[in-house]
Amino acid sequence: MLRCVFALCAALVLALPVHAQRIFENNALRGELVVKAPPEALLNGKPVRLAPGVRIRNQQNLIQLSGTLVDQRLVVNYTLDGMGLVRDVWVLTDEEARRWPWPRTIEESRAWQFDPTLQRWTKP
């Protein structure tokens, strides 16, 4: 009986959710994404196309299909591919969205310094 109690306690401890910090790429930009009719979307109010293999990660870091996000305003971090198509999208949690500053343009990301360990940007 005592073994069962220890096993149950161990299982409960291991089952606790882990709130690990997500790692964003150093070329990720911040913006507001509204998916229209996939692959069409608005990014910061401007029309863009989603790449054919776009990876959209929701707030739990699970892959989500673009069709399930139609007409939702989402605060995101995103990357672009070589053709200017949106390649990776991370839908931000409230805590991640408050992490500031974060570059909104390629020019800002080139001028600012990124610390990959702390996942923080600093302005010059």
Where are these regions (language model features)?
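Hydrophobic core
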Residues: 8-14
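Short, structured beta-strand/loop micro-motifs enriched in basic residues and often containing a Trp
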Residues: 51-59
